[in-house]
Amino acid sequence: MPERPSVPRHLLGIEGLSAEQLVPFLDLAESYALLSRSRSAPRDALRGRTVINLFYEDSTRTRTSFELAGKRLGADVINMSVATSSVNKGETLLDTAATLNAMRCDLLVVRHAQSGAPALLSRKVEASVVNAGDGTHEHPTQALLDALTIRRHFGRLEGLTVAICGDVGHSRVARSNIHLLTAFGNRVRLAGPPTLLPGAMAGLGNVELYSDMDRALEGADVVMSLRLQKERMGAGLVPSAREYFHFFGLDRRRLALAKPGALVMHPGPMNRGVEIASDVADSDQSVISEQVEMGVAVRMAVLDRLSRARMPA
């Protein structure tokens, strides 16, 4: 009888995790999604546990989603405001780690502009660490919620063609999704301007690069649109928003190139009229609102499973 995958202590990224290690997160999240819809989520799974949300970058969806997830499981949730904390007064990340460690929190959710910051914290604190997005590196819970959304519609997470379009080069969401989707044996197409499409990504598995958006969408089961991350861009990578939409915007004509009923996804926030047309974002094929809903369920599952790793045997 095969051994069951062990419960991880941290969730720092998707890279290196097998499909067998990822499925338990998705299965538990599925059950939490059903319970949340019936308003009967277990309120005591994290009772007596403390979750600290430490966000060095602005966030609405992810921080709120983690806060709801912790509270629905009965945890004490603390949102640390970096703008008014000692961090803003010059405290280093390692000093912050020492302070948080002294507070004896159980789970630490971290978003940081620097790639690798959550991994560094995980080596310095006793708490379980969840990466809520680090630089351009990874955003593992976003990939999990995207995977759950896809699985709910197709009944499987294998053998699909997924087109990820837009600012791939600066996207931690794209990287985590590439690792997850290829782990399950899917075909991934990356589409965008050559300036935003690093060639190294072709070496991440069953991945194809396209500078022609139309070709990338032909026969796709899922189309995932990404926003232009201007805060991480240098000058001149994209001539103008109008020109970008002309060549790489997801509109009705382009969506028709994908398979009938193909899912339309976006991690948010959306720039309507830049990477996606409003009538596509609001269409029956769009599952963008469902992604947000699944985000809470996935984060409940992540906090729950990581907390079990801290329980004595």
From Swiss-Prot:
Keywords: Pyrimidine biosynthesis, Transferase. The keyword Transferase applies. Pfam families: OTCace, OTCace_N. It is an enzyme of class 2 (transferase). Pathway: Pyrimidine metabolism; UMP biosynthesis via de novo pathway; (S)-dihydroorotate from bicarbonate: step 2/3. One of its GO terms (molecular function) is amino acid binding. Its EC number is 2.1.3.2. One of its GO terms (cellular component) is cytosol. Heterododecamer (2C3:3R2) of six catalytic PyrB chains organized as two trimers (C3), and six regulatory PyrI chains organized as three dimers (R2). HAMAP family: Asp_carb_tr (MF_00001). Belongs to the aspartate/ornithine carbamoyltransferase superfamily. ATCase family. This is Aspartate carbamoyltransferase catalytic subunit. The gene is pyrB.
